[in-house]
């Protein structure tokens, strides 16, 4: 996998992008309102947000920097930071206000670093092991996007 701009994409702390499944309904709605195309029947399948890992039941309000996701068959990921949208997100979503809506909604997802390598497949279960619980992903996202234009 190659990344074009390593200042905002890739690197060890951004090895895995995880996005909450529950936010897909929001994006389907706003894409329909914007008359954005690109996906048949506007289904937005898992992975459409650019994530490698789609999380069910875990979002930015439940994830804290340093939390660990431990998978049953091996592999440990640690939450490192929220995703910050760039101009390419607008193009990927098919309308010009997508990045702005990500900032306003806080539906950003999170980057994860690999703490212990392992194999993870669709449907695998994991357990959340709390980190120090000092900084919530959404709080960090809000702090870093406050006052910036998208």
Locate the predicted segments by residue.
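Compact, aliphatic and Gly/Pro-tolerant "microcore" segments centered on a short helix or tight beta-hairpin
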Residues: 76, 97-98, 110-113, 119
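Short beta-strand-turn/beta-hairpin segments enriched in glycine/proline and small hydrophobics
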Residues: 92-104
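A structural signal for small-residue-enriched, beta-sheet-centric alpha/beta enzyme cores
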Residues: 107-108, 124-126
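Short, electropositive, low-hydrophobicity segments enriched in small/polar residues
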Residues: 70, 113, 122
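Short alpha-helix capping/helix-loop boundary micro-motifs
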Residues: 55-57, 106-116
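Electropositive, beta-rich accessory/interaction domains or terminal extensions
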Residues: 1-89, 97, 130-150
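Loop/turn positions that initiate beta-strands
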Residues: 66, 117, 121-124
């Amino acid at each position: 996998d190659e990344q074009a701009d390593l200042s905002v994409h890739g690197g060890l702390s951004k090895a895995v992008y995880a996005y909450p499944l529950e936010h897909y309904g929001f994006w389907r709605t706003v894409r329909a309102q914007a008359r954005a195309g690109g996906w048949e029947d506007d289904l937005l399948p898992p992975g459409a947000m650019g994530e490698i890992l789609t999380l069910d039941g875990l979002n930015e309000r439940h994830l804290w920097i340093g939390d660990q996701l431990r998978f049953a068959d091996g592999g440990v990921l640690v939450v490192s930071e929220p995703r910050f949208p760039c101009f390419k997100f607008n193009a990927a979503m098919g309308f010009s206000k997508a990045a702005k809506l990500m900032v306003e909604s806080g539906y950003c997802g999170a980057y994860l670093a690999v703490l212990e390598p392992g194999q993870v497949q669709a449907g695998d279960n994991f357990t959340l092991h709390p980190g120090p619980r000092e900084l919530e992903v959404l709080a960090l996202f809000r702090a870093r996007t406050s006052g910036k234009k998208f």
